[in-house]
Each structure stands twice: as C-alpha cells, then as structure tokens.
Amino acid sequence: MVETELDTKKIDFLPDDMLEAAAECLKGMAHPVRLRMVNLLMQGEFAVHEIAELCRTSPNQTCEHLRLLKSHGFLSSERRGRTVYYKITSPQLPGLIQCIRKNCKC
C-alpha cells in the first residue's frame, strides 16, 4: 500500500460535540431578523413592542423569533406588568456579532 501525505499529516479537527454545539448555535441565529434582534439587544434590554418596531417586524413574528432565541439559551425575558422585556444572557453572542461585522462585508 502506498502511503500518502494525508496519511502521515495530523489533521486538527474540532471535537464532534463542539461541532454539534456550534451547528445548533448557528442554526438558532440563521435568520436576518434574529441577527438584527441580537444586534439590538446587545445595546440593552428592550420590550417586545420596541423590538418589533425597531426591527420592522410584526408583533407575532417578533414573538416567534424571540421565543426561538430564548429556547436556544441566547436570551432571557422578564415580565413587568403587561410588558415583557428581553435581554441577552449568552456571553458568546457579542463575539459572534463582532465576527459577522468583521468578516461579512457584502
């Protein structure tokens, strides 16, 4: 059998569990509206109606996107009276947004 360069080279793959976690994280973020919401929430806490207005989405769409982001552990919510406020709880999100800003020059 002939030995190739690839056989002798050590390939540095990320561990499978890390790749699975990254794919799940990116899947949760993989929508322009969700990215816009995260970008907004990096600037502070906002009520659902404020997020809807600033992100130019309907209240129903806003709630669905926020629900998904929260289910992935990116956000937390707090009800105060009749208003629900959201904020970022994931320490990884600011770095992800910075990476997008730096590398996605379209």
Protein language model features and the residues they cover:
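N-terminal leader segment of winged-helix/HTH proteins
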Residues: 1-29, 99
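Conserved segment of winged-helix/HTH DNA-binding domains
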Residues: 22, 26, 85-106
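Short capping segments at the starts of secondary-structure elements
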Residues: 32, 43-47
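Pre-recognition alpha-helix immediately N-terminal to the DNA-recognition helix
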Residues: 35-39
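Residues within helix-turn-helix
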Residues: 47-49, 60
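A short acidic, leucine-rich amphipathic alpha-helix
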Residues: 51-53
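Helix-turn-helix DNA-binding motif, specifically the short coil turn and the N-cap/start of the second
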Residues: 58-61, 89
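Beta-hairpin "wing" of winged helix-turn-helix
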Residues: 70-80, 87
